[in-house]
């Protein structure tokens, strides 16, 4: 019934297998990929007809993790997998980015790629396996895919690179890097580090590339045995369109791309586009899409030639020049920390809000439930590029936010030193390239403005590349048009000492490690320059948090005292909250976190906790409250939880006939500790008064 094809290989001591022919046989390509007990089903289907109204390649990648894969039932009221989580969206992008450039530009059929986690062992992470499975599904589908691609994760533990580390190994790693590409070239890099040098990062990319070449060879062997017939892709002859556009619009486009202002340049190009369409309006052989495609090719030729031959960029800068930078902090009066970062025509208002552990984000995944202390949200409204459009969070916003998150994360202080929860929001108010890196710079400034003791300021820069044959130019701080018309988008963020985050997307094959080395070197120079400009606004964190920030402090109590702090049925902790106005959180290790609206509230709560957990000291005088009257003396509560006996002979210097002659229940009194008897405290009011 089934004609099954299967290939296996061992990579980094783990067996990876690819199988096809048994499941999802009506898809154009279907692969069951497994590593350990983690299993991915990747399917791909392409529309058999081209949509004539499509002027782009409609590839959709939807990665999904099924809860049953880890033996779980989804939480919440509806027991079904809901909309994609942030993690699923990020992995979908991770799969899409190395695959998309490997389809020919004339291929416009709709393609849907669905990698699904159907078994998960909590040790072998599914994202790398999902890229492998997706690549294999495309390789056997017959579609015009110029792959296959492979992928690796690289860790760094004790100075040694680890290929495809387990989840446990990754927890001890100073590097989490994902690299994907073909046998000959790297196409995508995504990483988070603790601040590593350019040399270490480049070697990690090389190590990862070498690691996935055997996987690509396995996919190629599988495809030789079971690849479906190749799809035919019609390539329309547009030489006549190209010729007429060059004759009529080369001069106009050259002038347009010499215009520095983005909006003016965009308006000029739009007018040229309208004229170009009008030129072919009566020719039924060519659609507006055909004209648009060739006009874009002409734009690309003009800009790229100017950069390669004349070393001249669109806005007149040199190849390594960074646009003018303006930084301001404290721009919003009621926020905890804020910054306005402007670099050329790219601008971000970035705001830091500090909260308590109650504000941590609760996440559910195949690994279980966990809490996230640091959140960074990136918003890209259409007005930032002078357009109208949809408002909301898409994959692009999620991806840019996570990139900035990775850049900042390693510089944040640990919870033990600074017990706040962080939420950073980057509002992009203008955009002409590199808005995610503007978010990194603004986030660093906003954190320092909020009084967060970050380890080092962080800055980011986006690099570009123009390459024709062996001739290439690396561009620093690219514009939107340079990104669109160039061959590489290479974002690097870090401190003055090292890289904290790196993201690279390459649109062509043949990018050498020499080019990557040049880009990293140039990026470091740009990053140091940007940090210098940021330091002019604020060079270090403010000494304390702002006026409107919750005042937080932590105190560690003996585990034996946790019950005393909480009290019977929570009575004591409720009393502290009522009297101080602060919020309290007590964990199992005895760490008590106090969050208060102001200093006075925090001080009251802290003093009450100290009183409750303090130990009685011999000969020390305390304030107390008479709790019970007996014939032989009075029991007094002091230090919040401690009881002691004042014997009738220790009530006063004179002889006392009745205890009630001196005190009654509820009286506030001063007492001195005069001894201990089998764990009981002996007190004296008489000696306290002397």
Curated annotation (Swiss-Prot):
Reactions it catalyzes: RNA(n+1) + phosphate = RNA(n) + a ribonucleoside 5'-diphosphate
Domain of life: Bacteria
One GO cellular component, as annotated: cytosol
PROSITE patterns (UniProt xref): KH_TYPE_1, S1
This enzyme's EC code(s): 2.7.7.8
Cofactor requirements of the protein: Mg(2+)
UniProt keyword terms in alphabetical order: Cytoplasm, Magnesium, Metal-binding, Nucleotidyltransferase, RNA-binding, Transferase
SUPFAM superfamilies xrefs: Eukaryotic type KH-domain (KH-domain type I) (SSF54791), Nucleic acid-binding proteins (SSF50249), Polynucleotide phosphorylase/guanosine pentaphosphate synthase (PNPase/GPSI), domain 3 (SSF46915), Ribonuclease PH domain 2-like (SSF55666), Ribosomal protein S5 domain 2-like (SSF54211)
Tagged with keyword Thylakoid: no
Domain S1 motif: 619-686
GO process annotations (BP): mRNA catabolic process; RNA processing
Gene Ontology MF, one: polyribonucleotide nucleotidyltransferase activity
InterPro entries for the chain: ExoRNase_PH_dom1, ExoRNase_PH_dom2, ExoRNase_PH_dom2_sf, KH_dom, KH_dom_type_1, KH_dom_type_1_sf, NA-bd_OB-fold, PNPase
Main location (coarse class): cytoplasm
Keyword Metal-binding listed: yes
Positions contributing to Mg(2+) binding: 483, 489
Subcellular location: Cytoplasm
Pfam families: KH_1, PNPase, RNase_PH, RNase_PH_C, S1
Span of domain KH: 550-609
Family, as annotated: Belongs to the polyribonucleotide nucleotidyltransferase family.
Function of the protein: Involved in mRNA degradation. Catalyzes the phosphorolysis of single-stranded polyribonucleotides processively in the 3'- to 5'-direction.
Protein name as catalogued: Polyribonucleotide nucleotidyltransferase
Organism the protein comes from: Pelagibacter ubique (strain HTCC1062)
